[in-house]
Amino acid sequence: MKILILNAGSSSQKSCLYDFKEKNFLDNPVEPIWKADIDWTLATGQGILTVKANGIKQKITLNSDDHHHGIAKMLGTLVEGKTKVIQHLSDISIVGHRVVHGGTDYSEATLITPDVKATIARLIPLAPTHNPSHLEGIEAIEQVLGNIPQVAVFDTAFHSQMPLEASVYPIPYEWLDKGIRRYGFHGTSHKYCAEKASQLLNKPLTHLKLITCHLGNGCSLAAIKNGISIDTTMGFTPLEGLMMGTRSGSIDPAILIYLMREYDFTFEQLNEMLNQESGLKGVSGISADLRAIFEAINQGNDRAQLALDMYLHRLRSQIGSMLASLGGLDALIFTAGIGENAAIVREKACQGFSFLGLKLDLEKNANSPVNIDISTPDSTVRILVIHTQEDWAIAQECCHWLNK
């Protein structure tokens, strides 16, 4: 069984192909046999396609920024040239798409139909940089592969069972009818990490209280009780919550009113500043990359130190919020680029909860841990580092759908 995964961004297209040969593959993640990325940000009117397969890496210039053309070219590398891994595109059994926003319409992976496409299009105002790209990917597959089954896996789906007190904003109730509510994001990653934690702890997911910390360029936490997300830090959009690489996270909304009234800021300017010029980048004045922040701190840069201190303060504060929603904690989980690789972030985050009996093993924490428990034997709470595999999780959802 061959499953193709597409993960479209506003200016990129990431894809991979899994070849499932073993009956027990669902419990044992495997590496894709083919990976491809398209970057449309390097030059106007063109893109760069990078393909990895058969032990080689190939770069191809796309002389067009037409996304349909780019995806068709990308799919061609599956069946021709040095990156050929299958005989025919018809060898692909199913295609899985990561879709950022499914609103309240979908609580699980869903076969893509005209109605589903219409819903994704209707939700474009809530995810203007992502949902249009998802539709382009879906339609490109339709053009090249015809009626092959396509499944949408929504970032918002895992959070769809949040209780009303966690999902409704304290604003005029009528706004709820306009779709203004907390949706949550990174759901595929949070769900995968919760299930992996259940395996690592050898305990049923239905008996666990977990906090998953997805810390990358975008950051969010989820409070997971008995396998269900009951609270999360991102809300109506991925801008709410934690301080992130270039996003502000939660701020006083009156700041925006003030800037518009006193300084004539437009909503386009505010949107750009809050999403692209804030967070670690905005405070440090250096970069959204923590590695660059650490380097600047070592050189005595006070703004870089402030950016890190703010990031950690807000992280600890939001972990505390998730802890209160859960009313207890079995495991604190770190994942994604920062969560998996920044030992100092894990250390400082855990220090804030030593009063609970949570104890970090500093040696384990420093040794690039992956999919292991880094707490001390006498810690009252387990601390896990889990390598998130969103593409793999989407492939699992596709397989479950095929086996229905």
UniProtKB/Swiss-Prot annotation:
| Reported cofactor(s) | Mg(2+); Mn(2+)
A family per Pfam: Acetate_kinase
| InterPro entries (alphabetical) | Ac/propionate_kinase (IPR004372), Aliphatic_acid_kin_short-chain (IPR000890), Aliphatic_acid_kinase_CS (IPR023865), ATPase_NBD (IPR043129)
SUPFAM superfamilies from the UniProt entry? Actin-like ATPase domain
Is Magnesium one of the keywords? yes
- Active site (record annotation): D155
Kindly state which keywords UniProt assigns to this record, in alphabetical order: ATP-binding, Cytoplasm, Kinase, Magnesium, Metal-binding, Nucleotide-binding, Transferase
Enzyme class comes to transferase
Q: What is this protein called?
A: Acetate kinase
Underlying gene: ackA
